[in-house]
Amino acid sequence: DRAAEAVQKSGGSPLRLDVSPFLRGPMDAYSRPSVREVVVCGSLQVGKTLLLYACLGWSMDYRPGIKMLAMPTRESRDRVVEKKLRPMLQGSPVLRRMVAKYRREKILLKDGTSIELATAESPSQRASITVQDLFVDEEDLYSRSGDSSPLEDFKGRTRSYGDFAKIIR
């Protein structure tokens, strides 16, 4: 509920669990220590992206460490950061206090970690950093580049964290 509250205060579309009670299950699952990966399947416009950002906010508050938000393209990444993610972070007093600086490809956090903002179209971004928590958005729009699958490359970034890593997609 605290994560949903952060999204609601962001000024964007509210994450209303009274209207979309089915989102509570994946949010609760993500917050359980024993759960490593949550896969959310659903139709268009049911709140999957808001759910993803609520889990990102919860992770910032309760799981310090490097995070990665994976998007299909640079354009979608830039649009989402400006229209959804940044307003959510600025709209929550708890999350706003954690942010040190916004950059094009990452958000620096005051605890010395970051939220890496990666795209599926860049093999170098998919292979350049190890992350504790991975947030995969719009994976059905990922284009295969080269021999590898963008989703598998992104998931591979969490391998060093073993059973402590978390993925939501």
Model regions and ranges:
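Phosphate/NTP-binding elements of NTP-utilizing enzymes
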Residues: 1-169
